[in-house]
A protein has these predicted regions:
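Short, small/acidic-rich helices and loops at N termini and domain boundaries
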Residues: 1-88
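Glycine-biased, small-residue-rich flexible motifs in mid-sequence functional cores and linkers
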Residues: 2-7, 84-422
Length: 422
């Protein structure tokens, strides 16, 4: 499926990407000499290899327009959207980074991404309970406030970030280190379907490309590139999340970290290093929202609970004053909730009774097939929970709000780690 441009233009970008390779920075050295992707095809096909490096000769000679057109047909038949560098819906922030993808493949849509508050969030695959709890709360609050959460699809903090945002009915983006139709491992197919319905799954690699060690680091530059900032929740010295932070710093993006609760634990050494280098410590979602509210107030939700915490300066009051000075129309004030009585806990979805369901097994898990009708019910061989995917997004979200984290927890935890590649 083509998005925003004709096949006559897209086919030249497809050929160009095939000729030089998806994440190859050398193609951007060659393109200015040739002009456009179309002109590059015409000149190179005519024998002008003067700006093709020796490393790229084999790929350039192997690429043909026939192969490019067949790849476009394949993507159209598999409902894969394609966005070339010249596409009006191509993420503008990606255009500004070093070595942007010449072509993006997507399940889902990228429309509206250019003026959205996108935060790349993630961390270690083996987080502490403290980090999981804090990450869940912050990502949920960010999503409720209108922030788009972008991450990988690995088990651990990547899945925690995505799951928490989806529970808050927020938009999410997952960037893969392989092709969209490469299910590595195979269980991730279901997780990708859910994420695509709640936002988009992206890759710069051709649909059936398998992951390699080089693809993971290249993926992280795209992850940080589509975002305004990187939120690293927990990382040791060798954590792959640090490469996302490194790319974010090189791209001029903000870096945020959760303060560790064990200063001398090596599992937090990477985050401590980022904080020492000037990363912003995040105590709640407002530490991230404060950074962007002045410019992106129109994209945020004024009724989000995070803006109503008693005793703190209200973001909307501050912005109303700023807007009056600049002549801008102020955002509407948030609706206030009645404060909880002393010693009384505020009522939340989490504190509501969820144990009365008769659709649970002995361990308390919900058999979603008993609650949601669907033609796409999967039973993982090593994970006994029955879960369902539904085309009715509202039905899924309403079920989650009533039953907690069951649906996406089980889908993501049933999947092995896509980033675990030897």
């Amino acid at each position: 499926m083509m998005m925003g441009e004709s096949i006559s233009e897209l086919k030249y970008w497809m050929w160009f990407t095939m000729a030089f390779g998806p994440a190859n920075p050398r193609k951007w050295n060659a393109l200015p000499y040739y002009g456009t992707a179309k002109q590059a095809y015409e000149k190179i096909s005519g024998g002008d290899l003067s700006h093709v490096s020796e490393q790229d000769l084999k790929g350039v000679k192997a690429a043909t327009m026939e192969k490019a057109e067949k790849m476009i047909e394949y993507c159209n038949s598999h409902n894969i959207n394609m966005y070339s560098y010249d596409d009006p819906d191509y993420p503008e922030r990606l255009r500004q980074i070093y070595n942007p993808p010449s072509l993006l493949f997507a399940s889902g849509s990228l429309k509206g991404l250019n003026d959205a508050v996108v935060i790349a969030a993630g961390g270690t695959r083996r987080p502490s309970r403290y980090t999981v709890e804090v990450t869940e709360r912050i990502c949920r609050d960010l999503a409720q406030a209108g922030v788009v959460i972008a991450s990988g699809i690995a088990v651990g903090l990547d899945s925690v970030c995505l799951r928490s945002a989806m529970h808050a009915r927020g938009k999410v983006i997952s960037v893969l280190p392989c092709g969209l139709n490469c299910n590595y491992p195979k269980e991730n197919a279901d997780a990708k379907k859910v994420i695509a319905r709640m936002g988009a799954v992206l890759s710069e690699y051709f649909p059936e490309d398998r992951p390699s060690s080089a693809y993971f680091r290249a993926r992280n530059r795209v992850l940080s590139g589509i975002a305004l900032g990187a939120f690293i929740t927990q990382a040791g010295i060798g954590s792959g999340a640090l490469s996302t932070a490194s790319f974010a710093a090189a791209q001029g993006k903000d870096i945020f970290c959760i303060p560790p609760h064990e200063l001398f634990n090596d599992e937090y050494a990477g985050v401590i290093g980022l904080l020492r280098d000037g990363a912003t410590p995040v105590f709640d979602a407002r530490d991230i929202l404060n950074q962007y509210y002045g410019v992106y107030a129109h994209k945020l939700n004024p009724d989000a609970d995070i803006f109503k915490i008693k005793g703190d300066r209200d973001l909307f009051s501050r912005t109303e004053q700023d807007n009056s000075e600049s002549g801008k129309q102020p955002a509407p004030p948030p609706k206030q909730k009645a404060p909880a009585k002393k010693h009384e806990q505020p009522q939340t979805e989490e504190s509501s009774d969820r144990d009365s369901s008769s659709d649970r097994d002995s361990s308390g898990r919900v058999f979603i097939s008993n609650v949601i009708d669907s033609d796409d019910i999967k039973v993982p061989s090593e994970h006994p929970i029955v879960y369902a995917l539904s085309d009715d997004k509202k039905k899924i979200l309403d079920f989650i709000s009533q039953n907690g984290t069951v649906l996406f927890d089980e889908i993501v935890e049933a999947a092995s780690d896509i980033d675990d590649v030897e």
